[in-house]
Regions:
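Transmembrane helices of ABC transporter permease
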Residues: 20-26, 152-202, 273-288
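Loop segments that connect adjacent transmembrane helices in multi-pass transporters
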Residues: 125-130, 205-251, 319, 324-327
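Cytosolic ends of transmembrane helices, especially the final helix of ABC transmembrane type-1 domains
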Residues: 211, 223-230, 254-257, 261, ...
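ABC ATPase nucleotide-binding domain helical subdomain, centered on the C-loop/LSGGQ "ABC signature"
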Residues: 407, 415, 422, 440-480, ...
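A short, proline-enriched helix->beta-strand linker immediately N-terminal to the Walker B motif
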Residues: 500-504, 533
Length: 564
């Protein structure tokens, strides 16, 4: 567990964790010292004659030159001040624990999200989006809870060890008896409850995965659900997983309460036994053992919550262990490390002996060859599923060929230059996603807007008249997924987005297939007009959209067939 946790934490986090562990030892010493001070206070307060029998106390009384009762009063005031200091120190320590454990949510969530954004495109397409959401939100939060439990476990162990040492010094026989009795009871508790907690943790993880899957799938198919009136079926699925998730948490919370209830009951019985034992042993005079009884009462009063927290924290480690495994595996994913090498595009884009197939599947293409001259307009057509979009992903440098090469001006596309190459490409997909922000932000993807460039692409995409009539202009919110806009308006924003970075290559992946024929023809004419100096690669179903292309290739059985 520690190996995985240290892999996840940064160097600064590990250093702070070490500091917290050292600090917890200091806090434990303060806790133990605070309890140990009670014994001399009660002893002296119950019998002033100690000040006449103990040479150190005689020296103290002579040095202070005040009545004994005043010394006791000042001792009591000092004890109160020390206990206030102890309370403040504990509050500060628990603040540090919370700041570290819950603060890791931000740091680890950022690392996991960053990792998913930086894996290669092919691996990302094989991921389940609901799994990604679950990891970044639920599992990271669970891990932060697990870190909190780990730190609490360690700090309470230090407290127990030091208090145990103190009790051994006072009366080792009673302490050893108490130890055997409590360890035996704790072992029984852990043995009985651990399998239940582990099982509940696995059920929680499975239910949470299904929970996110149902949410993700059905919110993305809301129109279909409404059309087919499938609300009851969806709610039934949701209810089943929601109940399973709740039941797992109920089991965990219920079992977590058992150690406290059990140990409190046992602790009280043990305490009564100790008092009775000491009284019977000293029938004639119990004043001499009053301080011993007091120290054991206070020690047990402090040990019971510690023992409960240790068992509860251990159960939390078991319950959330699957979250640690999931985050660990996510962070071990290999990142796509792209270099900063520059490429120029003055002559041609060449596909040479290209072969590709998704991992574990047959090759879609074998030995494809194609030359695309700079400024040329080409189109790919073919049946659905023949690999047109995959081919475009390869041309855009998102997928890596299994065999063969993609060359730009005779220079092979690779990890060193892929970043610069991708920046040369403007992409307009079939399914356009606009996030719930301003038109300007949806076009530029940044807060640092180049107003001149923005104005230029708005004109090129024929959005100027539409935006001028909006009360807030380019700052108008488009709604989630562009719900406040028509299909044509969303398409034009997508065109403006593709043109904003001034690409040399423009890729249209069935970009206008959702529009009616008239709107499609109008938008395609506009795209051709503003892309005279650009290389265009178009995937199309309707042949009417590619009449102005220089070449048209049909993709069939993994091979090209030139049709124009």
């Amino acid at each position: 567990m520690l190996k995985k946790l240290f892999f996840i934490l940064s160097k600064e986090d590990k250093n702070f964790l070490f500091f917290l562990l050292v600090f917890s030892v200091f806090v434990s010493f303060i806790e133990t010292f605070a309890i140990s001070l009670v014994m001399p206070f009660i002893t002296l307060a119950s019998d002033f004659s100690y000040f006449d029998r103990n040479k150190y106390l005689i020296s103290l009384k002579e040095y202070l030159n005040i009545p004994v009762f005043e010394i006791i009063v000042y001792f009591g005031i000092g004890l109160i001040v020390f206990y206030v200091f102890r309370a403040l120190l504990n509050a500060y320590y628990f603040h540090l624990l919370a700041r570290f454990s819950k603060g890791r949510y931000h740091a680890i969530a950022y690392k996991v999200f960053s990792k998913f954004l930086n894996i290669n495109y092919e691996k990302f397409t094989q991921k389940n989006q609901s799994e990604i959401l679950k990891s970044i939100t639920g599992e990271v939060y669970n891990l932060s809870t697990m870190i909190s439990s780990f730190l609490l476990l360690m700090s309470e162990i230090f407290v127990v060890l030091l208090l145990y040492a103190l009790m051994l010094l006072i009366n080792y026989k009673i302490t050893l008896f108490l130890s055997i009795f409590m360890v035996l009871n704790a072992f029984i508790l852990v043995k009985i409850l651990s399998p239940i907690i582990k099982k509940a943790g696995l059920k929680r993880e499975e239910a949470m995965k299904n929970f996110f899957e149902i949410l993700n799938t059905n919110l993305n198919n809301f129109k279909f659900i409404k059309l087919k009136t499938k609300e009851d079926g969806v709610l039934s699925l949701f209810k089943a997983q929601s109940e399973a998730f709740s039941k797992a948490n109920i089991t965990n919370e219920s079992v977590a309460a058992v150690p406290r209830i059990y140990l409190e009951g046992i602790g009280f019985c043990v305490l009564v036994f100790i008092v009775v034992f000491l009284v019977l042993k000293n029938e004639s005079d119990i004043s001499g053992i009053l301080s011993t009884i007091s120290i054991f009462v206070l020690a047990l009063y402090r040990l019971m919550p510690s023992a409960n927290r240790i068992i509860t924290s251990y159960h939390d480690l078991l319950y959330y262990h699957s979250s640690l495994d999931i985050i660990y595996q996510n962070l071990r994913q290999e990142e796509e490390n792209l270099g900063e090498e520059k490429l120029s595009f003055n002559q041609e884009l060449k596909i040479y002996n290209l072969s590709f197939g998704y991992e574990g599947k047959k090759y879609l293409f074998k030995n494809l060859n194609l030359n695309i001259k700079k400024g040329e307009k080409i189109a790919f057509i073919g049946e659905s599923g023949c690999g047109k979009s995959t081919l475009v992903d390869l041309i855009m440098g998102l997928l890596k060929p299994k065999e063969g090469q993609i060359l730009l001006d005779k220079k092979e596309l690779n990890a060193n230059n892929a970043k610069n190459y991708r920046q040369k490409i403007g992409y307009i997909p079939q399914n356009i996603y606009l996030f719930n922000d301003s038109i300007a932000k949806n076009i530029t993807f940044t807060d640092a807007v180049d107003e001149e460039k923005l104005s230029k692409v708005i004109k090129q995409a024929n959005l100027e008249h539409f935006i001028k009539n909006l009360p807030q202009g380019v700052q108008t919110k488009v709604g989630d997924g562009g719900s406040n806009l028509s299909g044509g308006q969303k398409q034009r924003i997508a065109i403006a987005r593709a043109l904003y970075l001034e690409p040399e290559i423009l890729v249209l992946d069935e970009a206008t297939s959702a529009l009616d024929t008239q709107s499609e023809a109008k938008i395609m004419d506009e795209i051709y007009k503003i892309s005279k100096d650009k290389t265009m690669i178009i995937i199309a179903h309707r042949l009417s959209t590619i009449t102005q292309c220089d070449k048209v290739y049909r993709l069939e059985h993994g091979k090209f067939k030139e049709e124009k």
